[in-house]
Amino acid sequence: MPTDLYQGMSDFYNAFVQRNRDYKAIATELIDLFGDQQDILDVGIGTGLLVEQIIQLRPELQITGVDTSASLLEQAQQCLGTQVDLHCQDVVDLHLDKMFDLAYSRGGAWAFVNDGNTILLASHILDLDAIQQSFERVAAHLRDEGRLIIISSNANHGKREELDGEVTFERTVSKDGIEGEQYLILDYRCHRNGGLVGHQRVRMRLLDLDRVEEMLVAVGLGSISDHHNKYHIYQKKGSE
Ligand SMILES: C[S@@+](CC[C@H](N)C(=O)[O-])C[C@H]1O[C@@H](n2cnc3c(N)ncnc32)[C@H](O)[C@@H]1O
């Protein structure tokens, strides 16, 4: 069973992110980029909030979701039923009996974040070789000319939300440098009537865009567009 990085916040994850994010707007923009592609892989589907919106707009799509969090996947299963194929897998060891036209990550295994004038990959996978392997695994599941979209997120900013006067959700963000490498430290906390009822710390490795794109090229995924830094799109080379 892969390590569940989100176990400590599964009870309050949806309430927090639903107040912070317009999943319908993201789904609308994203399906525009899908074109006529049918077999879609969500890398780090979480509780399925984005896919719920996608299938309302495009019910004919065949969507598969993978995630390392059994607790969030349980909620995805309740929300999406049998319409979406769900697997508790680490993308680093991805083995699915299927090929895809397109894979994407929206704040899943990886996201891009804007750090001043620099675009950085924020990766839940910390080890460099493992990140490389995760790219290789996704490329191996894409058909020729298939695409990988890594979506930009604002996960590197703090947030505080009062739900109903009793419950408060909060994300605090700090940066840490260890042996010359940069990490984002995200602390999610839920308070009820001033008392802490949930806390989850998530660490993400930060990598320069250029370095990430070299790693993607090494597995046959070349950049074709970045949609104003919002949707970074990579395409797998067709076989000669
Ligand atoms: C911030 S949540 C985003 C969930 C969802 N994509 C959304 O937009 O609400 C990050 C998700 O990525 C998953 N994740 C992190 N590392 C992963 C990995 N190596 N393989 C698969 N899923 C991973 C986490 O378990 C978590 O569900």
Residue ranges with predicted function:
Residues 95-103:
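A short acidic, Gly/Pro-enriched loop at the edge of an enzyme's catalytic core
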Residues 49-93:
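Class I SAM-dependent methyltransferase SAM/SAH-binding core
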Residues 124-144:
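A short glycine-rich, Lys/Arg-flanked "PGG" loop and its adjoining helix->strand segment in the class I
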Residues 111-130:
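Mobile active-site "lid"/loop adjacent to the S-adenosyl-L-methionine
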Residues 211, 215-240:
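C-terminal lobe and adjacent flexible extensions of AdoMet/dcAdoMet transferase-like proteins
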Residues 1-35, 37-46, 49:
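Conserved class I S-adenosyl-L-methionine
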